[in-house]
């Protein structure tokens, strides 16, 4: 069951998304940061970044719900597992939210 969950999370996290501002661009520009909750946090306070964060977080929430239902797990547990992977996979110079709650460069 855990291996299925890991595979599904990997597919979720690797799926390409096309927006005016892409997630990769936003990360590279320091406009968003990953969190241990599994959701993006805005670093920049502009409309384009806010819209991207809202879209990505909504899609993630739906995916986390699907994975949780398929594996009989709480949604927040699935989200936290994904968040740990996303923070760990963040590149040097990208923002992540630390355990102190502050967004900082990795």
Question: What role is predicted for each listed range?
Answer:
Residues 14-18:
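N-terminal signal peptide c-region/cleavage motif recognized by signal peptidases
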Residues 2-8:
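Sec-dependent signal peptide recognition
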Residues 2, 19-106:
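Anionic, Ser/Thr-rich low-complexity intrinsically disordered regions
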């Amino acid at each position: 069951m855990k291996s299925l969950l890991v595979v599904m999370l990997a597919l979720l996290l690797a799926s390409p998304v096309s927006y005016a501002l892409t997630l990769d661009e936003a990360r590279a520009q320091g406009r968003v940061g990953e969190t241990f909750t599994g959701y993006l946090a805005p670093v920049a306070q502009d409309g384009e970044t806010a819209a991207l964060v809202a879209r990505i977080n909504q899609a993630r929430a739906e995916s986390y719900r699907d994975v949780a239902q398929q594996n009989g797990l709480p949604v927040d547990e699935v989200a936290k597992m994904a968040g740990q992977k996303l923070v760990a996979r963040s590149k040097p110079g990208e923002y992540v939210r630390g355990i102190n709650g502050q967004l900082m460069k990795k």
